[in-house]
């Protein structure tokens, strides 16, 4: 039994009410958690793929049957609109069905050999104990993207959720147990960054992390001390390019969705909108009209709801003040709906103009309901501006000339790019991740997600020996 000496209480960003109080796993307790996971790994790793898949499929079925209840938990915990919360549960369900089907798929291959009588087999094998360290902005999808392939590959897994999403993580763990995941194979530990650091230092074989670049850099450095495999998905300052032949109305809708849904708390939000000179004024006029009518507040059906906590509101407002201090114009937009509680962690949406794209304020990553507008003249200028950022997670290009859009896409430094779409919207069968400071070459989700959570074993058989 792991001793826990303190507790963590989370308050809803909607109204300041208590969501849940959970026990905190202290750094000194982490080695015992890892040891129990390692013990459980011994039997779980030799369970058949089909059996593991059947359990994960059951998890998906339970998530699906309880989707409305779970969506209300997400809304209470993070402040998200109810529809968005339901959509996230659906994404977790689909990830479960995708990964569970891998139990009936080929998990290796045969290679030809130059030596007569030799057969070479390449197969996947589990790594051991996986530490899953996730952020708050999409709790159930984050858990599903990491836990399902980690478990399907035969690993034991320890989830360290954000302090902002303790209830959803606790319920997710309970559902896995209900579905038949053996004791110790999947555990949830609550705590601060010190708890996460202790997990890495305890010698886990894999660390899967979603969060900011500065923290991700520390995670990779700490993991390297034990040569632990890392799956890293970090931040973004994602560009959405609008060419002069784009459908402006549709492009405006894409910007509203990409920049302001989830209150801009996506690593894939469109925080830089790069518009061609010839249509800039017309585009901005349409965008302002659309932005003025988008709803914000704490009602369940608004587009822009709360940020996750008051510190996030302060950081967002501080960024806007910094942008104004260097000459930017900040227009506050949106239609407030209802009468939010004084404790609500709300920030009015904003549209920013007048920044240099290569300035600190022009390139910075921020979490909040805002976007920055920039102008370009030639396509090569748009490409250069888009690639100015140190990040390279997602991007979007809007043009009615698909060949032109494809030429731009070929030169963009990003891991996920949409033509005539938003900067977000990855599907579960698509690998998701970035380049430059947005990742390290690993990918979450996708049909090959199990590869990220396993290693390769090569076996040769010599016949006739």
Model-derived features with residue positions:
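Rossmann-like NAD(P) dinucleotide-binding subdomain of oxidoreductase/dehydrogenase enzymes
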Residues: 109-250, 376
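Residue-level signal for inorganic ion chemistry
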Residues: 16, 52, 74, 96, ...
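Conserved C-terminal structural/oligomerization subdomain of aldehyde/semialdehyde dehydrogenase
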Residues: 17-21, 339, 346-465
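N-terminal Rossmann-like NAD(P)+-binding subdomain of aldehyde/semialdehyde dehydrogenases
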Residues: 1-118
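ALDH superfamily catalytic-core signature
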Residues: 206, 214-356, 419
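Structural signal for hydrophobic packing residues in well-ordered secondary-structure cores
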Residues: 41, 45, 60-67, 71, ...
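Short, well-ordered beta-strand elements within core beta-sheets of diverse protein domains
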Residues: 19-25, 40-46, 132, 240-243, ...
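Short loop/turn microsegments at loop-to-beta-strand junctions
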Residues: 5-8, 270, 393
């Amino acid at each position: 039994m792991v001793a826990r000496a303190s507790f963590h209480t989370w308050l809803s960003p909607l109204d300041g009410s208590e969501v849940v109080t959970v026990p905190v796993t202290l750094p000194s307790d982490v080695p015992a958690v890892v040891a129990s996971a390692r013990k459980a790994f011994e039997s779980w790793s030799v369970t058949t793929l089909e059996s593991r898949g059947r359990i994960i499929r059951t998890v998906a079925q339970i998530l699906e049957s309880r989707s409305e209840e779970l969506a209300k938990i997400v809304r209470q915990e993070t402040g998200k609109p109810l529809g968005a919360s339901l959509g996230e549960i659906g994404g977790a369900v689909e990830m479960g069905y995708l990964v569970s089907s891998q139990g009936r798929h080929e998990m290796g291959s045969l290679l030809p050999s130059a030596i007569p009588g030799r057969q070479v087999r390449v197969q996947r094998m589990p790594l051991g104990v996986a530490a899953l360290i996730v952020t708050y902005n999409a709790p159930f999808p984050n858990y599903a993207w990491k836990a399902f392939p980690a478990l399907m590959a035969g690993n034991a897994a320890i989830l360290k959720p954000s302090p902002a999403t303790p209830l959803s993580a606790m319920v997710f763990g309970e559902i896995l147990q209900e579905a038949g995941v053996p004791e110790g194979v999947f555990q949830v530990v609550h705590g601060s960054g010190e708890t996460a650091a202790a997990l890495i230092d305890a010698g886990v074989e894999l660390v899967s992390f979603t969060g900011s670049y500065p923290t991700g850099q520390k995670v990779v450095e700490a993991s390297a001390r034990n040569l632990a495999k890392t799956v890293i998905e970090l931040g973004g300052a994602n560009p959405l390019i609008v060419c002069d032949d784009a459908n402006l109305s549709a492009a405006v809708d894409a910007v509203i969705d990409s920049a302001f849904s989830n209150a801009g708390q996506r690593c894939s939000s469109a925080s830089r909108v790069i518009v061609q000179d010839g249509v800039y004024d017309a585009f901005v006029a349409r965008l302002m009209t659309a932005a003025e009518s988008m709803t914000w507040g704490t009602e369940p059906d608004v587009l822009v709801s709360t940020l996750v906590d008051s510190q996030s509101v302060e950081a967002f407002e501080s960024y806007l003040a910094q942008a104004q201090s260097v000459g930017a114009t900040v227009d506050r937009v949106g239609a407030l709906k209802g009468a939010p509680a004084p404790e609500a962690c709300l920030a009015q949406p904003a549209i920013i103009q007048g920044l240099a794209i290569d300035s600190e304020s022009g390139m910075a990553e921020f979490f909040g309901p805002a976007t920055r507008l920039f102008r370009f003249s030639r396509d090569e200028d748009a490409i250069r501006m888009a690639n100015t950022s140190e990040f390279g997670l997602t991007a979007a290009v809007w043009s009615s000339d698909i060949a032109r859009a494809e030429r731009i896409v070929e030169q963009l430094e990003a891991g996920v790019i949409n033509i005539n779409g938003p900067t977000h919207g990855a599907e579960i069968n698509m690998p998701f991740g970035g380049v430059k400071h947005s990742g390290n070459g690993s990918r979450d989700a996708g049909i090959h997600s199990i590869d990220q959570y396993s290693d390769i074993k090569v076996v040769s058989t010599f016949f006739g020996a």
